[in-house]
Amino acid sequence: MPPRRKRVSSAPRRRRRTYRRTTAHKHQERPVHRRRRRRH
């Protein structure tokens, strides 16, 4: 049984960086993100 990684600590930090830094790249890959950003 491999040790479980703690994603709770990294999740919030990675989400904020991805949204701001890879905005263009994100909506190019998944259009869903673009719709969510517009509603936000």
UniProtKB/Swiss-Prot annotation:
Its main location: nucleus. One of its GO terms (molecular function) is DNA binding. Residues 1-40 are annotated as: Disordered. One of its GO terms (cellular component) is nucleosome. Testis. One of its GO terms (biological process) is cell differentiation. It comes from the Eukaryota. It is found in: Nucleus; Chromosome. Keywords: Chromosome, Developmental protein, Differentiation, DNA condensation, DNA-binding, Nucleosome core, Nucleus, Spermatogenesis. Protamines substitute for histones in the chromatin of sperm during the haploid phase of spermatogenesis. They compact sperm DNA into a highly condensed, stable and inactive complex. This is Protamine-2. It comes from Bufo japonicus (Japanese common toad).
